[in-house]
């Protein structure tokens, strides 16, 4: 970078915006990022920005230079060492020499960040204001930016104490003077020549006011009449003449309304309320007429007004709930803005208000208010149903259709809010009236479908004791005119009310018949698939929620499934099997085995028939066999043992479980499917479910399953075998929950050791440069290790031949894996191990009140002392490279616990950690002494005072700063 020329930067910028190859663009981008981090960037950017450019021929170059300076001030001030005063002067000079808005904004951000970080600069804001006074437009821009920058400690390298102290020093002395300056700008605006270089705009004044609004109590701000009048007058003038100023005023008033949330000054709220209502009367005079809003008013005007009323509604939700007589007109405005606007994106702005309003109104103390507002919520139900209606024509694109469908679910949440307020009967009456009207008038399917959809979304809020409206609705639905889309919608409605049906068995038969008919009436039609999907989904819920009522229907249900399964997709088959599982589970003990066997026999016959085809074409047929195995998995969804333990009685389904395992073992071992990863994965999934559901009742098949899992994993290395092995550990290692003999528990420990040894042998053969290719196997291994730590903590910690290799694998993998599930699994496993180094056990267990000293010594010696330095290094590297933000808490937890144990082992003296911190920083590189010392100070002080939050926050702040400074892209 030493011989860099300005022309090199121009060439790179041109390349990025040209038609050059992506490879060339990436190289240009990399070059520019290297430049932005270099020391020479300071002087070159100054050189670029110092050149006159009257025709804006070099605008892109100048913007890049200004952005680079902003980033340099943010991250690289340490490069300037003792030259900060000279840079400050040059930055102010550059600021006054430019008139392009984008450049001025970037330089002002740089100036604000410099003022915050350059602690030796005394009274910086007064100096800046004095210098920029002759250029009010630039000064306004700076003053707008300054408070925004004081919100973000992440854009500085300061400690929290330094940052907060500096902010008070910069903001507090000038806050009231800024308001006076803004008032003077109003006069200047009225008298200035719009073409002068120092001219200011109404938008600038309002944007600046918006930034500073947070610095004052709302009561104080509202006393500055010239500014408040300006806000309301600008909005009152509408958005036709000055759209930017209108938007700025809307933003400003939204802040004021938001800040009024906590005020107890009723006069203030009353005054704002009246001003809002005056704005509505002025700008939306026909809001309450039948005229369509979007035909009469500009979309941006409607959006702005919606934002204002929503902001007020959310801020005053409690007082609105208390005073319906006073605030009802405002709620009516929100009702109209919700129901009459065709722009559904803007309509959605109102949804949080309705939710929060509902939260208040359902409280007992607002019972009278709820009655007063009920008519509004009834109208809201009807307005939402209208919005739910599909358009009569086609959507312009698939994207538009998907967006509308997603939006319907959000609108459904509002209907739930309405139902909670007006009550079950009143809420149900609204779609019922519309359905009856649609039938009488023979309306299009769109008009019928919308109220049906609304019924679907209301279901969770409907009382299970409702006995008047819902029976009528159910009967009407089951006799609706036949139309595919109506059939689809009505079937889904029935599926949502199955809990209600369980309390009203007299309506079960008619609903089941309606659903069964749906499979037959539309067979062969283009809509058949969607109807089958809806019917299967509904039947699943009927079987689940009405399982006891359906005990006598089991033969009919099974025959129905066997008849239709060949004509329905696998997802629908799966859902039906899930539903059947619930009904089977409620069968009498004497019958359950025979009934279950009927479905099992059919399934296994189909698998057996597929085996010869699979042998001929495994790639094509393996998924089909796997799907059939998945149906067995679904059949175990609701099945449970009849007794808690085998000593209480024999399990009637155990012979069926043994039968299933024998058939699957034949497929896997005799037919050779144990080397087919797709089939093995589904079998592992099924076995896990069987063991989780029937736990110790499965002991008769345990030896055979364990032998198969050992042999299968040894032969193939498939992670599924490890994943399934974990379920054996969870069941037969848990001697507190189940009657497990010591010999059986020990046998499962030896089984687990064998699986771990096989993984470690396999891992040593992995290509370490391609670890991401093995992430699934790594997840399965560390999931198994987590199970071992949970149920065999002592055996695991004292097994040095296992503990050491596990740590080595973890440290080699954790920051090299891109897969989130993989590295988070390792992090949590490491955390589990380290947590046993404290006196209090990390799990709730009857048998261990205090962690044995022998276990703790193992953690101290074999984990912290032997691997701790490397552990925190790899975790720090992961924190600044591969780990997503959501994994940071887990990684930092491991680091802090490791340092805590090290400190405790050193007679509670945390200075021993300094050397580790310094080594980490040295390995990371590109860390200033100040940044290093701030990290070490936060860690040591926090550990010594047992303020572990301080340690975590110190590490988090360092990681965030390091990533932004050295890792994240600076190029915009």
From Swiss-Prot:
InterPro entries in alphabetical order: ARM-like, ARM-type_fold, Exportin-1/Importin-b-like, Importin-beta_N, Importin_beta-like_NTR
Cellular component, GO, one term: cytoplasm
Subcellular location: Nucleus
Domain of life: Eukaryota
Main location (coarse class): nucleus
Keyword set, alphabetical order: Nucleus
GO molecular function: nuclear localization sequence binding; small GTPase binding
Any one GO BP annotation for this protein: snRNA import into nucleus
Note: Present with 6340 molecules/cell in log phase SD medium.
Role this protein plays: Involved in mRNA transport from nucleus to cytoplasm.
Protein name as annotated: mRNA transport regulator MTR10
Organism from which the protein derives: Saccharomyces cerevisiae (strain ATCC 204508 / S288c) (Baker's yeast)
Gene: MTR10
């Amino acid at each position: 970078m030493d011989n860099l020329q300005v022309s090199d930067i121009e060439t790179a910028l041109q390349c990025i915006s040209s038609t050059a190859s992506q490879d060339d663009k990436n190289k240009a981008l990399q070059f520019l990022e290297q430049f932005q981090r270099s020391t020479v960037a300071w002087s070159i950017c100054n050189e670029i920005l110092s050149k006159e450019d009257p025709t804006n021929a070099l605008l892109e170059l100048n913007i890049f230079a200004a952005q680079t300076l902003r980033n340099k001030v943010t991250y690289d001030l340490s490069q300037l060492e003792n030259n900060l005063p000279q840079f400050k002067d040059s930055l102010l000079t550059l600021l006054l020499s430019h008139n392009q808005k984008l450049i001025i904004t970037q330089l002002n951000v740089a100036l604000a960040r410099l003022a915050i970080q350059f602690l030796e600069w005394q009274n910086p804001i007064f100096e800046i204001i004095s210098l920029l006074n002759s250029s009010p437009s630039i000064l306004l821009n700076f003053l707008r930016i300054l408070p925004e920058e004081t919100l973000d400690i992440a854009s500085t390298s300061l400690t929290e104490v330094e940052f907060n102290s500096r902010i008070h020093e910069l903001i507090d002395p000038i806050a009231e003077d800024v308001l006076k300056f803004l008032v003077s700008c109003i006069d200047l605006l009225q008298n200035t020549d719009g073409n002068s270089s120092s001219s200011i705009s109404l938008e600038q004044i309002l944007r600046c006011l918006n930034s500073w609004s947070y610095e004052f109590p709302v009561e104080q701000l509202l006393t500055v009449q010239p500014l408040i009048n300006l806000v309301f007058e600008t909005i009152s003038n509408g958005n036709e003449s000055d759209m930017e100023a209108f938007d700025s005023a809307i933003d400003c008033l939204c802040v004021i309304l938001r800040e009024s949330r906590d005020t107890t000054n009723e006069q203030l709220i009353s005054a704002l309320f009246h001003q809002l209502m005056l704005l509505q009367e002025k700008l939306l005079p026909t809001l309450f007429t039948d005229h369509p809003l979007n035909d009469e008013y500009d979309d941006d005007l409607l959006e702005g007004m919606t934002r204002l009323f929503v902001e007020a509604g959310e801020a005053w939700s409690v007082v609105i709930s208390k005073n319906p007589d006073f605030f009802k007109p405002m709620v009516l405005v929100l009702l109209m803005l919700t129901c009459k606007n065709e722009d559904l994106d803007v309509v959605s702005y109102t949804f949080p208000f309705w939710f929060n309003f509902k939260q208040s109104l359902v409280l007992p103390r607002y019972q009278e208010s709820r009655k007063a507002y009920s008519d509004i919520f009834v109208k809201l139900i009807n307005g939402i149903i209208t919005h739910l209606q599909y358009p009569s024509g086609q959507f312009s694109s698939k994207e538009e259709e998907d967006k509308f469908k997603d939006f319907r679910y959000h609108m459904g949440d509002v209907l739930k809010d309405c139902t909670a307020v007006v009550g079950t009967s009143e809420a149900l009456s609204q779609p019922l009236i519309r359905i009856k009207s649609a039938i009488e008038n023979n309306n299009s399917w769109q008009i019928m479908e919308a109220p049906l959809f609304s019924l679907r979304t209301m279901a969770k809020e409907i009382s299970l004791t409702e006995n008047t409206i819902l029976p009528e609705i159910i009967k009407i639905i089951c006799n609706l005119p036949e139309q595919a889309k109506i059939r689809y919608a009505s079937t889904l409605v029935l599926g949502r009310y199955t809990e209600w049906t369980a309390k009203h068995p007299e309506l079960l038969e008619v609903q089941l018949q309606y659903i069964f008919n749906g499979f037959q009436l539309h067979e062969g039609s283009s809509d058949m698939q969607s109807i089958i999907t809806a019917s299967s989904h509904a039947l699943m819920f009927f079987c689940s929620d009405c399982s006891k009522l359906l005990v006598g229907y089991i033969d009919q249900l099974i025959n129905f499934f066997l008849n239709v399964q060949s004509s329905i997709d696998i997802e629908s088959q799966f859902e039906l099997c899930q539903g059947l599982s619930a009904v089977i589970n409620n069968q009498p003990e004497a019958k359950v085995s025979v009934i279950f066997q009927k479905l099992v026999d059919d399934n296994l016959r189909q698998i057996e028939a597929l085996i010869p085809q699979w042998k001929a074409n495994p790639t094509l047929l393996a998924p089909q066999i796997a799907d059939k195995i998945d149906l067995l998995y679904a059949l175990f969804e609701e099945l449970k043992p009849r007794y808690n333990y085998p000593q209480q009685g024999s399990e009637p389904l155990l012979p069926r479980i043994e039968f299933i395992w024998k058939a699957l073992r034949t497929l896997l071992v005799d037919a050779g499917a144990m080397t087919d990863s797709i089939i093995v994965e589904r079998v592992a999934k099924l076995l896990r479910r069987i063991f989780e559901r029937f736990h110790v009742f499965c002991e008769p098949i345990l030896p055979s399953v364990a032998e198969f899992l050992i042999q299968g994993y040894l032969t193939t290395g498939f992670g599924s075998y490890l994943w399934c092995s974990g379920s054996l550990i969870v069941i037969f290692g848990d001697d507190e929950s189940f009657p497990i003999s010591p010999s059986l528990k020990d046998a499962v420990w030896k089984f687990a050791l064998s699986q771990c040894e096989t993984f470690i042998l396999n891992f040593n053969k992995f290509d370490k440069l391609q670890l991401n290719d093995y992430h699934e196997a790594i997840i399965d291994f560390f999931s198994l290790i987590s199970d071992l730590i949970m149920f065999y903590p002592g055996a695991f910690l004292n097994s040095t031949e296992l503990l050491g290799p596990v740590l080595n694998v973890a440290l080699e993998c954790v920051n090299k894996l891109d897969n989130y599930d993989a590295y988070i699994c390792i992090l949590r496993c490491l955390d589990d191990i380290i947590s046993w180094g404290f006196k209090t056990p990390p799990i709730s267990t009857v048998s261990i009140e205090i962690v044995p000293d022998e276990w703790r010594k193992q953690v101290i010696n074999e984990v912290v002392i032997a691997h701790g330095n490397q552990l925190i290094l790899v975790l720090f590297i992961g924190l600044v490279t591969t780990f997503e933000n959501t994994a940071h808490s887990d990684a930092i937890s491991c680091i802090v616990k490791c340092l805590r144990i090290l400190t405790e082992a050193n007679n509670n003296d945390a200075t021993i950690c300094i050397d580790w911190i310094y080594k980490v920083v040295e390995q990371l590189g590109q860390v200033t002494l100040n940044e290093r010392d701030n990290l070490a100070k936060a860690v040591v002080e926090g550990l010594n005072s047992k303020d572990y939050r301080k340690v975590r926050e110190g590490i988090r702040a360092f990681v965030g700063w390091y990533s932004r400074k050295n890792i994240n892209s600076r190029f915009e």
